[in-house]
């Protein structure tokens, strides 16, 4: 039973570090100690990744991101340019904004937890613009789309 955050954290790190025998990391080893699931969108030459790292399927990693292991990134995540993740666990559908730096953190939903179990409600702390749900349409993107549609409509005959 893994009932406490520090225990869960250590269990994931132990798997990534190869300390637990007969447990294999899913995906393909794309670099020594770096495993990726299906359809990971990344230019491997334009990111800085030091294993052990697992990147879940359908995750998007923008140029300039940095990942230092042991780190697990769940499926369908999005790391923006300049985001840094070290010694952390990022659960599915998490979006890390540009220049966000996470060290020794677990991120899931609107919560960020350190390895002692202390949590931060990102929405209540007004930090939800830094770490969000990757499935959400961001207001800035929506604003850009609105401007593009307005430009198209204004040039139509």
What are these regions (language model features)?
Residues 1-157:
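Left-handed beta-helix
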């Amino acid at each position: 039973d893994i009932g406490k955050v520090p225990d869960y954290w250590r269990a994931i790190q132990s798997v990534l570090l190869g300390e637990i025998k007969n447990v294999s990391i899913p995906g393909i080893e794309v670099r020594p100690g770096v495993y990726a699931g299906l359809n990971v969108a990344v230019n491997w030459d334009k990111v800085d990744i030091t294993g052990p790292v697992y990147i879940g399927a359908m995750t998007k990693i923008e140029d300039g991101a940095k990942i230092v292991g042991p780190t697990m990134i769940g499926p369908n995540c999005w790391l923006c340019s300049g985001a840094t993740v070290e010694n952390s666990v990022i659960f599915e559908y998490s979006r890390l904004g540009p220049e966000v730096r996470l060290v020794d953190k677990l991120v899931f939903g609107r919560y960020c937890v350190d390895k002692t179990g202390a949590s931060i409600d990102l929405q209540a702390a007004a930090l939800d613009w830094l770490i969000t749900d990757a499935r959400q349409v961001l207001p800035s993107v929506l604003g850009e789309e609105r401007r593009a549609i307005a430009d198209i409509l204004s040039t139509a005959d």
